[in-house]
């Protein structure tokens, strides 16, 4: 186990199976996981639980990942929590969706993107890098 | 002066004088601000390049198309078409757009073939000319009106040009043939060539004279040969002489300074050569045909683009759904692997459940896709709707109960068996019920009502919930294929499929929904069998 293990990860995804997947990957890396099934619940859990990192799905009904991310960054208590965004949004819109374009929408960019379907090794590696830095 | 004119799409301003240069893109700092998700912030620039202008893509994500071809940098010519995202623009070198008929000049000093206006022939018939002048003017107005009316109505260019050629034979009473060539307007971008021959006159299989077409399209000049036989300069134009033509005229089809093709009228009648007046009328008619041809081309382009966009939307939506299912399958099998490694049976079961659930979702998605695309005639048979609705409700009851959502079937009176396609209606109602249950939270209820309207011979199925309801912007798109509010869980096909099933039954589908007031979908279906099916075997 590295220094980056044993951290608290908040997983925000409307799809319970996707939450279970990320939970399994994070627990395998030695982290603890709390989860939320939507943007509003995610923001509330972030305030209540002070996670070390947030894994946030883009495509959610109600408050989507973009909006949730923008609100995280506006909240002084939460703004410094690193965010890994799970995205398939480029495919959804049928366009080359660059990080610059994402910046256009939300003013700021998350620390990392991981594409769905999630590659467990890549997700674990990205999280380890962000928490170990 | 160079100018960009927005033909289609969101942009500000609608027209832009280019001057030394201009940048187009989504950023408010651009000279021409174009909206839409396919447009990059600084998408493309147009700039003065020597004597002319050039266009250069600024590394945009989705590229720039000029006259139908992708390009990174190209010289621009008057009338070029530029596509940036969903926006279509045309580049004009003259700010004063001149309609084709006035842009065209007769050139009396043309050195070859046919600038001949046979004044001698006209002088001989001077008295009849005066007498028929009023009639001729009226005929001109009539033909112009007829052509422009048809130009507005017909978007199929071949049909339009045929009508215009018929009109030419009507107005030029001495004409035996009328021909048109539209360059690149045919199948596979071949030239479209059309000819008409006056009834009872010999056909002219050779079509338009290549000599005249060359002059009209290369030099952009209208051409008149008043009396072919009397003009020894026509020796080169064998195609005219060999066909026993006595008089002929030809006009280019011009759109701005772009040549779309040409029209030609000819006669084998030695006594009635065409006059300069006739040529001027031909030029005016050519202007109308050119506008119509351009409209038709634009229409075809827009349809092709819409089709491409729809296919792109469908493919990307499906790809997204499939990716989500793959994510589930991958996640499930990852958890199964961990369980196997640790000999943790609970984990294996948990992972395996995820795999099964996602395989099931994929299976439902494929069924929806096939049902949505299938083009089979519905088979309507007398069906006990109460039984059908009861069965369908049972299919969602377990999920509803788990969420704490109540369900009920309410039947008003004793509805007679209705003639429906049971499979289609069941799938439609199941989709509505699934949506309703998903939209509801604990304590809400979902109800299916069945009511018969004996007076109108129709039945109405209503699926009602007291969930969160829909905002107007959601309501407006809710039946669009691939529109979904369910995030990763939705294919966006469910309600589009409901609509398709109802349309196949010649029924009616309506939605009442307000935010905070729940939603109600009403399906009206004709209860009796359609006539052709009722009288069939």
Residue ranges and their predicted role:
Chain A
Residues 20-28:
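Charged docking surfaces used in two-component/phosphorelay signaling
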Residues 60:
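Receiver (REC) domain active-site loop signature in two-component systems and cognate sites
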Residues 13, 57, 87:
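Active-site residues of response regulator receiver
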Residues 1-8, 115, 119-133:
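Non-catalytic signal-transmission and effector/linker regions of two-component phosphorelay proteins
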Residues 35-44, 65:
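Helix N-cap/capping motif at the beta->alpha junctions
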Residues 64-67, 71, 90-115, 121, ...:
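Alpha4 helix (beta4-alpha4-beta5 surface) of REC/receiver domains from two-component response regulators
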Residues 49-55:
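Active-site beta3 strand of CheY-like receiver
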Residues 12-13, 36, 54:
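Conserved sequence signature across two-component system core domains
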